[in-house]
Structure formats: C-alpha cells, structure tokens
C-alpha cells in the first residue's frame, strides 16, 4: 500500500485551488475521440459540443474549419456536412459538401436559446464512396466574433470576452476505413 506523507492540510503547499468560471455563454467540447468513418456511412459524428447560456440569446453564426487529408482526386470528400441538435435529433443547419482539403464553413441559420439552457450539438458528415483508406477529416469550431451572438434580454451583442472559452475548439481526426471481413 501507498501511505500518505501528509496527514492534514495545514500549509498552502499541501493544497491546490482550482477556480472554474463560465461566461454568459460557455462552450464545452464533448468529442468524439479519434475514430473511423466507414465508406458510404451516413451522418457520422465528427464533432460534438455543448453551449450553455445565462441569458436568452440568438446565435447568428457558427463557424467551423474542416481539414481533410490524403485526397488523391477531386471526387473525394465529405458530403452532407451539417449541425444537429442532439436532444431533439433534428438538423438545425443547411448541409454542405466538403470537397477541398481545407474548408471554412459558416452556418448562418439562427439558433435561439433560453436563459439557463444548455444544449448539445453535433456535426455530422457522410462517408463518400470515393474516399480511400486513410483519408481523414478533422473539424474545429472557430472562435466567435463580435455580432455572432445576440443577448435578447437587452438587445445587444454578447461581448466576445463573455464567451468562454472564446478560442478554437479542436476536434479529433476521423479516418476512413473500408469495411473488411475475414472468413476462416
């Protein structure tokens, strides 16, 4: 057994303090962990996040950046890139096809949230049949800018300093894997 060398917390050096603080709008990255996308798969989750708000708000823009690798021809890509409300199992943005290796995508579909509400969202893509084993996609939610989120309680824009964290939330690489079967 491992025995403790500290029997009581009687000095500052024996304790740590952790302060967590949210903003008027708080973002949380939920995943997924790095994984695989099957060829011809539909609605594969490539980014999952939660938004929580103190006030009634309207989100005017969601900005994403998608990076894909190992594309060998122009027919490869990730079609049907869109955002869902996870709890409602409903698509909340228009869908776009990602056909280049680096793509910025801003969704301008308006999302309203009530004060005290926390909502989980996910970004999905389809696995294009032309993709090769080893092709991958990595999605990031870009930082909000002034005017992206409006506080409906006082009819002003939420200051970017009140969005926590207001930096890029990077997702994990999702790699194309062709299905295989082994018979013995």
Regions found by a protein language model. Give the residues of each.
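Exposed, polar/acidic Ser/Thr-rich sequence context and nearby capping/turn residues
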Residues: 1-184
């Amino acid at each position: 057994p491992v025995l403790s060398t500290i029997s009581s917390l009687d000095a500052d050096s024996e304790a740590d303090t952790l302060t967590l603080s949210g903003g008027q709008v708080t973002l949380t990255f939920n995943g997924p962990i790095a994984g695989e996308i099957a060829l011809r798969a539909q609605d594969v989750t490539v980014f999952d996040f939660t938004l929580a708000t103190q006030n009634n708000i309207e989100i005017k823009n969601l900005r994403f950046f998608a990076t894909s690798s190992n594309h060998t021809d122009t027919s490869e890509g990730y079609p049907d890139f869109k955002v869902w409300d996870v709890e409602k199992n409903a698509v909340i943005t228009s869908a776009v096809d990602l056909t280049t290796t680096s793509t910025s995508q801003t969704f301008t579909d308006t999302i309203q949230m009530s004060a005290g509400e926390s909502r989980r969202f996910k970004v999905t893509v389809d696995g294009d049949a032309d993709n090769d084993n080893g092709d991958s996609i990595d999605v990031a939610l870009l930082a909000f800018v002034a005017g992206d989120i409006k506080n409906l309680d006082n009819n002003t824009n939420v200051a970017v300093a009140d969005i926590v964290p207001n930096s890029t939330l990077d997702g994990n690489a999702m790699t194309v894997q062709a299905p295989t079967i082994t018979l013995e």
